[in-house]
Amino acid sequence: MKQRMSRKENQVQTRKRLLDAGLEVFSRRGYYAASVDEIAAEAGFSKGAVYSNFSSKEDLFLALIDRRFTRDAREYPGIINFMADGLQSEKEPDFKKFVMRDRTWNILMLEFFLYAMRDETNREKLAARLEQLRKVMEENLAASYTKLGRKPLLPIKDLPWSIFSLGVGMMLQFYVDPDGLPKGVYERALQHLLK
């Protein structure tokens, strides 16, 4: 017999479903075209469920980036393995697979950038979140270089900017010209950055 969820578990599940629906709707329609009604319907709830979990559409939008950046911060040790093992590693990232698997999120990430570029208040909110993520990445990279007994080619504080720029730039080009991306170019460029 299936045990009933507690009130707290139910709230967590509802919030997760709303965030998942928000990810789909915002990436499909864009921030400005997406509606709270559409997000609620996608999640199988009423609009009231959205407002009992988020103060506004913007709050839900920003909660999506917070959720993802928290996950990404936990995954940065994978970069350390890539640094240590090099391109021959079985742990080597596959940029094309990653970009295709994460297409919905990547579209949403671009929507975040557009949202921030259109309004100064929004820009400051996204900038603060990106700064936190870069800080975590910088700390992980510094620890990695120390552990490996190596010195980076670029100042540590420049590496998160460079790594993000490399990934976002190649991602944009890949979505427009998927067959044009040279095999392994992202991995080689990342390896060079992390020498």
Language model regions located:
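Helix-loop "lid/cap" segments that line or gate small-molecule binding pockets
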Residues: 94-100, 109-119, 189-193
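Hydrophobic/aromatic-rich alpha-helical bundle segments in the mid-to-C-terminal region
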Residues: 123-127, 144-193
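Amphipathic alpha-helical packing segments from all-alpha helical-bundle domains
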Residues: 74-81, 100-107, 120-147, 188
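Residues in soluble alpha-helical coiled-coils and helical-bundle/repeat scaffolds
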Residues: 55-59, 63, 100, 104, ...
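Hydrophobic alpha-helical connector segments
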Residues: 63, 74-105, 156-163
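Basic, helix-initiating cap at the start of DNA-binding domains
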Residues: 1-29, 33-45, 58-59
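Amphipathic, non-transmembrane alpha-helical scaffold segments
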Residues: 11, 19, 65, 69, ...
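Amphipathic alpha-helical segments enriched in hydrophobic/aromatic and basic residues
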Residues: 26, 35-36, 47, 51, ...
